[in-house]
Amino acid sequence: MLEVVLPVIGGKLLKHFGVFQKEQERVLINYVMYFALPILAFKAGHQVKLGLEVIKISSLAWVSIVLCMSVAYIIARLYKLSNKDLRTFLLVSSFGNTAFLGYPYAFSYFGQEGLQTAIIYDNLGSFLMVSFLGVMVASGKPDLKEVFLFPPFLGLVFGFALRGIPLHPSLDKALNFVDHSTLPVILFALGLSINLSGIRDHLKLSLLAILIKVSVSILAVYLVGRFIELSPVAFKVSLLESAMPPMMFSAVLALRYNLNPNLAFASVGLGIALSFLYVPLVVKYCGGGI
């Protein structure tokens, strides 16, 4: 996964040598939030094909996110976290890295069919929920205006609305060009933001968030998925997606709403590293590739 590590290291090194400042991360995050990610969301909404199995796959993501957030809220209250720490903890404990890590893992283990399932799980499951519930948690208020005016959510809605209209090849090419920049820019911003002392300071909460995110999600998807009659590949890929560590976009929201980005980035970074160890075990447990 060199493509994952390289932009992070590049951002970290360039900050170390004074080429970039930590404060410049917000410019990059705004680029993602207001330009690149809405385009990616538009394309996802425009390409998705609705059907009963699609609804079943999406519902697995919804159930797992709600359960993770419920467990995380109880634990956060027990730890008496501050308001900003609590909201950050809820974000990193509930939403999984189902696109950035989930897509490569799904394709690697289950091929093109697995990738299609992962796209459904991510776009109509994780991304839809983080655009709605995640923004509500991050902003600290049930403000529907904030949610419905959230640029990536608007992109997803417009994509759905225009599903029956084919895109001109030139426009499609331009949109592809922009959406391919999304993940590298987020990773580079992570490199600018990452703070090793911050990881040490938040190690306990980060590990706890990862444990909640992975274990509760896997358990929820495994138990519910057995009863809703998914195809074997859809079930296995949904289980794999449920095992993804904290979502990169949770850290973006933590930055955007001035929560605790050090906790968020520590959770994301540790989660990515740990996923290389535990994901193969999840795949082996759920039956391996097709």
Over which residues does each language-model region extend?
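Alpha-helical transmembrane segments of multi-pass small-molecule/ion transporters
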Residues: 1-290
